[in-house]
Amino acid sequence: MSIYPNVLLDLYPYCNAHCAFCSYHGKIRHVKPMSEEIYHKVIDEIGNSGECIEIMPYYYGEPLLNPKLFEVCDYISDRAPNVKISISTNGSLLNEENIEKLLKIKTFYFFNFSAYAGTKSTYEKLMGLNYDTLDKIEMAVRRFQSERPDVRLCVGATRDPRFVTEEDSVELVRRFGNIVSFHTISFNSQHGNLNIRTTPQTNPCDVIFASAVVYSDGRVGMCCFDVNGDLIVGDVTKTSLFEALNSDLAQKYRRAHINGLKDVIPICRSCTQPV
């Protein structure tokens, strides 16, 4: 078993989309680009451990906005060769230049395209992007299928009737085939108290065990849905990532989930993430 969960690096927390279901634009946390010192420290630590985990060089932002994205990916591939790089994009910035650079990422493992709706009216309302973004995604998918068959591809979608119609789902499958992956959209109190869970729940959530977030200022969180950083358990500017993830507070949060008491944690109490 790995001593590290999968890690999201909050390298460049800015986004050009306006997804109707996302809490990004309602966040109250101060954001800034992550310093080279912080991400080098985290990547070096994981690389020195020899662990085979996933690193996602983004968090609640569009990774292709980051002018240092490919520099960071090269650093991960060189300093932590056992690590698998996963990237999720809204696709709006996919062009020939960026696709060529993405194709050259050595330890690229998983590439997700957030599409969600297949018709023009729904897509532009839901994502806040131009409909021709789906053409850019299709171009990238074809290139990767041809030139990097080792990279797992996924087109993210939902069948949630609050956001899309059946026609949207059918059109996405028509365009992208079996790489379309439908999932439930999760909400918590950071989404403005809309669509949150109000009934008690005791089943533990796997997210708190399987993922960690290093925020742009170096603080460490335990949940990939925690856009505001409410579940902070340490700070890599003061300790190692391993120490942060095994702090007393981190263990307290995990025990609460294991013991059926996750609802004592405010953000978990409202969360609809399936368990």
Positions of PLM-derived features:
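Conserved C-terminal portion of the radical SAM core fold
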Residues: 6-10, 50-58, 79-86, 107-119, ...
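Conserved alpha-helical substructure of the radical SAM core
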Residues: 1-111, 125-135
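Generic beta-structure capping elements
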Residues: 25, 114-116, 223, 236
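C-terminal accessory region of radical SAM enzymes
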Residues: 139-154, 174-200, 219-220, 224-275
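Short cysteine clusters
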Residues: 15, 19-22, 205, 223-224, ...
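Secreted/processed peptides and extracellular or luminal domains of membrane proteins
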Residues: 21, 25-28, 211, 229-230, ...
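A short, flexible beta-alpha/helix-coil linker loop
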Residues: 26-29, 118-121, 251
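Short clusters of hydrophobic/aromatic residues that line enzyme substrate/ligand-binding pockets
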Residues: 34, 94, 123, 205, ...
